[in-house]
Amino acid sequence: MNGLFLAGFDAGQTQTRCRLSRWHQNQWLPIAEGLGSGVIHLHASEGEERFEKALRSSFSKAVGNAGLRSEKALISAAAVGASGIEHDTPMQEQAQQLLARCLKIPSNQCLATGDERTALHGAFPQDAGIVLISGTGMICIGRNDQGKEQRCGGWGWLLDEGGSAQNLGQKGLQLSLRMADGRIPDRPLREKLWRALNCSSATAIKALVVQPNFGAAGFAQLAPLVVAEAQVGDKDAIAILEQSAHCIAEAITGVAQSLGLSDPKICGNGGAFEHLQPFRELIEQAIAKRMPTASWIKGQGDALDGALQLALRQLKLNPD
């Protein structure tokens, strides 16, 4: 089969996905996918080794699933989306060099970028639109008809993670400590959160959350419990959800205004948005209040499709 042989990667903390596809006669011909290990922040201890292992393992699996031998998988270009990779930074260059080394192709045929950009180019390959990712963290990014892109959020949970599962869990845990102090009446939320963390005192909570392996994911695991209490009428839990939804509406409005999108199409992604239905409803209500002409749509493709689109652009080709 003729055509360009391309690889797209979506690198996450738990796993990395690779999709192989051919671009032939102006259409995509999917070949195979593979799952590999997860990544951590590239500048963390063992970050580079974990990143390279994730790329190699997922690519090897995809090649095997395609019934090919690695020496026959001659990639024309590749792109990877991973959380925390900022445009035009040394980290982006480092990630691109690693991708090139893994696939044995020139670095100018590789692109490493944030997973929000691969999600955007997957959901809206050619059209204007905004992608929201509300999972452990939160970020949104949009593009207008002139091709200008604008991002909002995604600055890390220590600085700006309103609108995320981490934010819901952390605010809920803070609320539980106020209950333990007697500042507000004790309610079932405190007991449920502490039980989930296997803690029986405020001092145990304090010691737990500073452990290196707790972090954003540790708070995020508590989000469903906060949502559940909001559903049964806990007013403070409801307020946490409403404030977090407001943060998302604020970010999406900022992107839309910056790009001149008066009636933006929005595609929502991420575990908090997709699986915490009451939270999702509040997000939709908050955005409808700020931008009544906005509409929610299902994206044309996923982050791997977006990675393949960006890989093709490395060859100065566009799927038009």
Predicted regions mapped to residue ranges:
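Active-site nucleophile and cofactor-binding loops and adjacent substrate-binding regions
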Residues: 109-118, 133-134, 295-305
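ATP-binding/phosphotransfer module of carbohydrate and carboxylate kinases, centering on a glycine-rich
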Residues: 1-71, 122-128, 175-320
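Short glycine-aspartate micro-motif
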Residues: 6-10, 75-79, 129-133, 140
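Glycine-rich beta-strand-to-loop/alpha-helix junction loops that act as flexible
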Residues: 79-85, 134-136, 266-274
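Glycine-rich phosphate-binding loop of actin/hexokinase-like ATP-binding domains
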Residues: 127-179, 183
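Conserved phosphate-binding catalytic cores of ATP/NTP-utilizing and phosphoryl-transfer enzymes
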Residues: 1-2, 107-131, 148
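Short beta-strand-loop/turn "lid" adjacent to the catalytic site in phosphate-handling enzymes
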Residues: 40, 59-102, 112, 121-124
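Glycine/charged-rich beta-loop-alpha catalytic/anionic-binding loops adjacent to active sites
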Residues: 100-105, 148-156, 286-295
